Amino acid sequence: CVRLQLVDFRGRRPQVTRQSIERPLFITGLPRTGTTILYELIAQDPSFRSPASWEVTRPIPPPKEASYNSDKRIRSVDRQLALAEKLSPGFRAIHAIGAELPQECVYILASHFISEQFGYMYNIPKYRSWALSQDMTASYRWHTNFLQHLQVDFGAEHWVMKAPAHLAYLKYLVAQYPDAAIIWTHRKPLDAITSFSSLVCTLRSGFSNAINPLAIGQHEMQHFSKIASMGMLDRSALSARQVFDVS
């Protein structure tokens, strides 16, 4: 539904296609390595804009600067997120969610149908493996289309965005955003994946009554080991001045 609305709006507002996304900042790294707290910290800088949960969830019409902090959709999305906590009790204590908090890029990419978001919520290992093998050129082009839409009535000097999943697709990200800067966060992998596996168990409890923590932990370790390897391979082809490490 969101995708159809965005495509329709883009066709009726040609100025959307003329929006320029300049020098965006992307935060990535294994999950539970401090990406979220760093994201929310940098988003406080007035020279950056981050896509808020409410505008990613309900992007039609594009947000306006004058009503950005009072838009009626904020309240509606907050109610929706409260329902998510009822479905997966305890999730909010593990990972902060809120209509006005910065949202991850997996939710933007989900409307292009290739996204880690689905694998976090459901036990779909074949899909996740398939997604890692896909050419993401069109997906990151869609990512740009989404940002163009969000800023058409509320310009952004620079965007700051975040998703651990970008680690698997750095070559596609940089091909779409050649002037992007990338922050790669670090933590002991065992600690990071153990913490993330706990998050996945909690999140999936809202969609399944067959949660196997051991199987989830084993799969997440294998999955993100592959993602980290993909990220290191892609990074070797990037300028050292484009990627910054934080630990």
Features from the language model and the residues they span:
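PAPS-dependent sulfotransferase catalytic domain
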Residues: R12-P14, S133-H158, A163-S247
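PAPS-dependent sulfation machinery
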Residues: V56-W159
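Glycine-rich phosphate-binding P-loop
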Residues: F26-P46
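Residue-level marker of regulatory loop/turn positions in helix-turn-helix DNA-binding domains and
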Residues: Q19, L30, K162
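Post-Walker A helix-loop "phosphate-sensing" segment adjacent to the P-loop in P-loop NTPases
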Residues: Q44-W54
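Catalytic cores of glycan-processing enzymes that make or break glycosidic bonds
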Residues: C1, W54-T57
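Alpha/beta-hydrolase fold active-site loops
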Residues: R23-L25, H158
